[in-house]
Amino acid sequence: MYQLNQIPSETQIKKYIRRIVFGKNVFCPLCKGRRVMKQQNRYRCARCRIRFSLLSHTWLADMKLSYQKFWMLLWSWTIQVPIRQAMVLSGLSDDAVRRWYTRFRTHLPEEHHILERIVQLDEAYFKDHCLIMGKQKGTRKLAWEVLRGTSPNRTHAVSFLFRKVKPGSKLWTDGAAIYKGISRWWPVDHARDIHKKFEFAHTSEIEGMFGVYRTWSRRMYHHHWSINLEKYVREFCFRFSSPELFNSPLFYLSKTLSLMPID
């Protein structure tokens, strides 16, 4: 593994994680007592006598990487280092890097946007799946849904509006039949572009998003199966709508790493 200036020492990384998980003082994850004793790299609660570590009650409990290698992978993922580049940096296999990138993606917070004012809506096709995506014009707010199959109908479009578009909004789409008469099903002011007539003004932003997604996924992941489309679209949309979460590994961990509830 390469040694890079942006990768902190193991001691510093442990300090970051301890502060994120426990705050100023380490406490027992079970009884919350602060009478804990440190024994090498683990802690022992004087009250309930359980042993624990910095990561034992988090989603990193099974981590077998060194702290610095873990930080390098997380840093690579936050700045969108492609899989193959991350393999060279870390010395890990393709499968290992993909597993860690998947884990980081899985722990992104939930994000739900209700689009309003002017909403551009379109669909794109990926082998045996369809992606319906809406964008609030002039903003970073996206809403999306992945459907199995390549034949979406009006029911799918209307269901999308029910859950993701505010009543009274302006809806701009292409001339697809699934949008015809849609304002009778949900209160929107609907306008259409007919692409055969070279009309693109109403859907330019959302169609551009599909192009950006395809470029991003090929560059960062090289390839992915359509069955995993939803996972990658979620990451892409999160990066677009909430780029601040990816400012640094430390900021990402501060929003995603915490003690898991104990029954």
Locate each region found by the language model:
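Residue-level recognition of single "structural anchor" positions
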Residues: M1-D263
